[in-house]
Amino acid sequence: MSNTFEESLKSMSLDYLNLLINGQAFSDVTFSVEGRLVHAHRCILAARSLFFRKFFCESDPSQPGAEPANQTGSGARAAAVGGVIPVNSVGYEVFLLLLQFLYSGQVSIVPHKHEPRSNCGDRGCWHTHCTAAVDLSLDILAAARYFGVEQLALLTQKHLTSMVEKASIEDVMKVLIASRKQDMHQLWTTCSYLIAKSGLPQEILAKHLPIELVAKIEELRLKSSMPLRSLMPHHHDLTSTLDLEDQKIRRMRRALDSSDVELVKLMVMGEGLNLDESLALIYAVENCSREVVKALLELGAADVNYPAGPTGKTALHIAAEMVSPDMVAVLLDHHADPNVQTVDGITPLDILRTLTSDFLFKGAIPGLTHIEPNKLRLCLELVQSAALVISREEGNNNSNDNNTMIYPRMKDEHTSGSSLDSRLVYLNLGATNRDIGDDNSNQREGMNLHHHHHDPSTMYHHHHHHF
């Protein structure tokens, strides 16, 4: 009897979902999201979401139970006259996932495995706990709260709670901030514990978290007797040692900001300042000029390939993310490794190729509009050339016959791919977005992928406007 009941519910869920997949079939409301039309049904949306119920009532005061409209924006007016309702508060992918949950009561909030994402440089990633997966879940959480779909919000919180156990500490910090904003106590507890356990000093935490959250993390550490920094040997001297280190780091950064590399040199020689542990090179790449970075490297006290933080990014990873040819060039001149990998196996070349792919096939995406195509092309060529030189040197230095047969093939393949990438970048960077095509088929295609593969398959671009 129970199985029959479950099958009946599943069948009904699929029937409702097919209404959404088929787009215009019996549709009586149309939304415009990121230039694409989404066809839906008022009765289902109103029954499942308090937000939509109020929205449709405000747009049609003659409806039974309609409440007086406090605000009648362009969306409400469009709904009243049967026009297209613009949606600017969420992206197309997240909006479709939200509707999928409203229609069927089920949704997969994990990106499609191996799908290229703008915020994941690993082409073979399964997107189970990477930055792309975390960002999508956070966007769904915000959308669920905005549209009053509490069941989806709770489902997403549960998913994030299990995800952060394997996520990078930077992503855990993002989730912590969101859990505080969305008042998700369980998620807050999990994230704050993970960050406290990480041992990152206040100086690093303050770069990613509001000061009041840093204070709460420190309070949790004191209550739990967690070490503030694993490199500090004496438990009873943690506070004083941290204060001294923080003072050194602040002085060093002020010196770098004023291009006073000589003062940094004196701090290294006289005060024992560790440029790697203080992330001096990372800070200089992010905030200073090429000349300062060059002078800092020429001191000989900083490891150009030092893996910083829990993610293991090097200065070259940061320069690649910034799309700064000047920084990329000066780092490569001082023997930065273009093949060095983060904890997640991502190289600087992976980052640049992912950014290039976004420009080639999707146009300048939101959040990356500051990137100049020519600079991206130059960065890619510089890093590719450096990787090719290393590949050739390894091939020439290898005396094994088998290896000498293998290396040229790798080199040729790499050269071909690099050349093709460069030509495509040169010809196509900065191209406009692809034609949108038929909106109804887009909706059907997007929903079919979610329905059959149980995960999203369209790129989501971050927006922060209002519905």
From Swiss-Prot:
Pathway(s) it belongs to: Protein modification; protein ubiquitination
Keyword tags: ANK repeat, Cytoplasm, Metal-binding, Nucleus, Repeat, Ubl conjugation pathway, Zinc, Zinc-finger
Domain of life: Eukaryota
ANK repeats: 247-276, 277-306, 311-340, 344-378
Cellular compartments annotated: Cytoplasm; Nucleus
Annotated knockout phenotype: Defects in rosette leaf development. bop1 and bop2 double mutant displays leafy petioles, loss of floral organ abscission, and asymmetric flowers subtended by a bract.
UniProt xrefs under SUPFAM superfamilies: Ankyrin repeat, POZ domain
Compositional bias per record (Basic residues), positions renumbered to this chain: 449-467
Gene3D superfamilies, A to Z: Ankyrin repeat-containing domain, Potassium Channel Kv1.1, Chain A
Zn-finger region bounds: C2HC NPR-type: 117-131
GO molecular function: zinc ion binding
InterPro entries cross-referenced by the UniProt entry: Ankyrin_rpt (IPR002110), Ankyrin_rpt-contain_sf (IPR036770), BTB/POZ_dom (IPR000210), NPR5/6 (IPR044284), NPR_central_dom (IPR024228), SKP1/BTB/POZ_sf (IPR011333)
Main location group: cytoplasm
Region of interest: Disordered: 434-467
GO cellular component, one term: cytoplasm
Sites where the protein binds Zn(2+): C120, C125, H127, C130
Domain BTB, chain residue ranges per copy: 27-111
GO biological process, one term: leaf morphogenesis
Family: Belongs to the plant 'ANKYRIN-BTB/POZ' family. 'NOOT-BOP-COCH-like' (NBCL) subfamily.
Assembly notes: Homodimer or heterodimer with BOP2. Interacts with PAN.
Comment on protein domains: The BTB/POZ domain mediates the interaction with some component of ubiquitin ligase complexes.
Record function comment: May act as a substrate-specific adapter of an E3 ubiquitin-protein ligase complex (CUL3-RBX1-BTB) which mediates the ubiquitination and subsequent proteasomal degradation of target proteins. Acts redundantly with BOP2. BOP1/2 promote leaf and floral meristem fate and determinacy in a pathway targeting AP1 and AGL24. BOP1/2 act as transcriptional co-regulators through direct interaction with TGA factors, including PAN, a direct regulator of AP1.
Protein name: Regulatory protein NPR6
Source organism of the structure: Arabidopsis thaliana
